[in-house]
Design a protein with these regions (language model features):
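Juxtamembrane intracellular "pre-TM" segments in multi-pass secondary transporters
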Residues: 1-2, 182-213
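Intracellular juxtamembrane helix-capping segments at the cytosolic ends
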Residues: 26, 108-123, 311-324
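Cytoplasmic helix-loop-helix junction between adjacent transmembrane helices
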Residues: 100-136
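Glycine-rich segments within core transmembrane alpha-helices of 12-TM secondary carriers
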Residues: 129-147, 339-347
Length: 383
């Protein structure tokens, strides 16, 4: 493994802790501060909206100032957003807490660019493996983030969880330590990135469209159910916070641990077959969720939810990098992430409403619609 890829992995571990901490805490804190129950998942949803709105900007900014500075600015920004969020908990401001989560989402949008940066420091044939390895770093984030957040939650007396976000600020800024030693590979000038095909020309390619569908709806299913899980488990089913946190950790680990083999599986069997497997894994989640809502069933459902996301998202991302030329990469990556995370934002925004108005089981059945869309795209678009 080359030095640059190793540094990106280490930096990603700390930069991405914002994501599992947000998943772990936002619904619980949202339920505490929100004026009505249906707004409990609004902070989580706004963090995803932040990801969506900053996705294209992140790619655009990096095309001008480079990956290294882009990642450093994002770490500083996430640190500031975490401090703002801690302050919002101290003064018990739901509005300010939502703003903090939105800005943290903006930082997460930049951290999603690590997977593309990884591709740029390896040979193109190694791209699926590089993407898998960089996503594998998410396991470290999944265990470091929530554990540190849980340990530090009472650091500020009378303001539970404010300490968690102070800890997140430290974790976020720590990623810059590794970026200092990162040597950005030489690329074409920023002016040349203005050339190449338009977005509509790019998306007219069947492979590009397939990559987009797989990634977008994988995120839709995963986010729709994951956002609702802490509230459904802890607040509705009265399962302990520690058990709820452990299920979320296992889910995030399941999202990234298969990355050890996913790249090799794609290389051996092709993108389509691995995407089909992802759909089947999602189906296991839905079937499991139709039974009793207990600790074990939540655990099994969320593990398979993570596995399905991994197969679909890595397949989609590794297929995407085959669909554009060097001068088009930031445009293609930016628009892809804009669409993927906009759909994720819609799923996250609607999760709290659907959970409040329907049920956990109904939400899982709704996800069948997304699975049908992915399956249809696979059958109609042959890769």
């Amino acid at each position: 493994m080359n030095k640059n890829l190793s540094l990106l992995i280490l930096s990603q571990i700390f930069a991405f802790t914002a994501a599992p901490v947000t998943v772990f805490l936002s619904g619980i804190i949202g339920s505490k501060f929100s004026p009505i129950n249906t707004l409990a998942t609004l902070p989580m949803a706004l963090s995803v909206v932040g990801i969506a709105l900053f996705a294209f900007f992140a790619a655009k900014l990096m095309s001008i100032i480079g990956r290294k500075l882009g990642f450093i600015y994002a770490s500083v920004g996430t640190c500031f957003a975490s401090l703002l969020t801690a302050y919002s908990i101290i003064i018990e401001s739901f509005v300010l807490y939502n703003l903090g989560c939105f800005l943290i989402g903006g930082g997460i949008a930049f951290s999603h660019q690590y997977r593309f940066a990884a591709v740029e420091v390896v040979d193109k044939d190694y791209a699926p493996k590089a993407i898998s390895i960089i996503l594998l770093a998410g396991i470290g984030s999944a265990f470091i983030g929530p554990n540190i957040a849980n340990i530090s939650k009472g650091f500020i007396s009378d303001h539970m969880y404010a300490g968690s976000y102070l800890a997140l600020a430290i974790l976020s800024i720590s990623s810059t330590i590794f970026l200092i030693f990162y040597q950005e590979p030489k690329t074409i000038s920023s002016n040349q990135y203005k050339t190449g095909r338009s977005f509509f020309e790019l998306i007219s390619q069947p492979r590009f469209l397939q990559a987009l569908v797989a990634s977008a709806f994988a995120y839709a299913v995963m986010t729709f159910l994951m956002t609702a899980t802490p509230i459904s488990m802890h607040l509705m089913e009265k399962i302990s916070l520690s058990k709820t946190g452990f299920v979320i950790q296992l889910h995030i680990a399941a999202m990234f641990l298969p990355s050890l083999v996913t790249g090799n599986l794609i290389k051996r069997f092709g993108h389509s077959k691995i995407m089909y497997v992802g759909v089947l894994l999602f189906l296991v989640t839905i079937i499991t969720s139709l039974f009793e809502q207990n600790y074990i069933n939540y655990m099994v459902a969320l593990i398979f939810l993570g596995l399905g996301w991994n197969f679909l998202f890595i397949s989609g991302t590794s297929l995407l990098v085959l669909c554009y030329r060097e001068e088009e990469k930031f445009r293609a990556q930016g628009y892809n992430d804009l669409i993927v995370y906009s759909i994720q934002a819609l799923a996250s925004l609607s999760a709290g409403v659907f959970l409040s108005l329907t049920s956990w089981k109904t939400m899982n059945l709704i996800c069948l619609i997304f699975l049908i869309i992915i399956a249809l795209s696979l059958s109609l678009i042959h890769i």
